[in-house]
Curated annotation (Swiss-Prot):
Compartments, record wording: Membrane
Organism this protein belongs to: Arabidopsis thaliana (Mouse-ear cress)
Protein name: HVA22-like protein f
Membrane topology, from the record: Multi-pass membrane protein
Record's GO cellular component terms: membrane
Species lineage: Eukaryota, Viridiplantae, Streptophyta, Embryophyta, Tracheophyta
Residues spanning the membrane: 2-22, 41-61, 63-83
Annotated keywords: Membrane, Transmembrane, Transmembrane helix
Family according to the record: Belongs to the DP1 family.
PANTHER family: HVA22-LIKE PROTEIN F, HVA22-LIKE PROTEINS
Length: 158
């Protein structure tokens, strides 16, 4: 029983490096090798946020030492940033960072999207965005809109 309690108390130290460093490192390597820029956005944003968290920790470490729950909060936040089902880093980028930093932005590969098209793409998972971006690059955005309308029409039938 003491072993389980010891693991529970140090859960952040056991899982943290894998969640906060190893998986993002692996995913960043994959993102660099992929032809699309959408996953680059997720991982570059993650590393920026992780760096800011680290700078924050180094700046106020004396205060954080008095907060026993800080490592667990950091772990949960980083899990939200990293896990593909949440894509928290991409969410933070699209909802906060992007509003203040616009440097000739386009969502991906050189195709300029309207704000409405960007919103539609941001609602999708990273893999779905990649697929739609590839489809748009091949066939154009009009074909995506036709496919969406056809799917809506089909769902109304059933």
């Amino acid at each position: 029983m003491g072993f389980i309690i010891a693991i529970a108390k140090r859960f952040d130290a056991l899982v943290g490096p894998g969640v906060m460093l190893l998986y993002p490192l692996y995913a960043s390597f994959r993102a660099i090798e992929s032809p699309t820029m959408l996953d680059d956005q997720q991982w570059l944003t993650y590393w920026i946020i992780y760096s800011l968290i680290t700078i924050f920790e180094l700046s106020v470490w004396r205060v954080l030492a008095w907060l026993p729950f800080w490592p667990y909060l950091k772990l949960l936040f980083c899990m939200w940033l990293v896990l593909p089902m949440f894509s928290g880093a991409a969410y933070i980028y699209s909802n906060f960072v992007r509003q203040y930093v616009k440097i000739g932005m386009n969502v991906g590969g050189g195709t300029n999207y309207t704000d409405e098209q960007r919103r539609v793409l941001q609602m999708m998972s990273l893999d779905a965005r990649k697929s739609v971006q590839d489809y748009v690059d091949r066939f154009g955005w009009d074909s995506v809109e036709k496919a969406i309308k056809a799917a809506e029409k089909e769902t109304r039938k059933h």
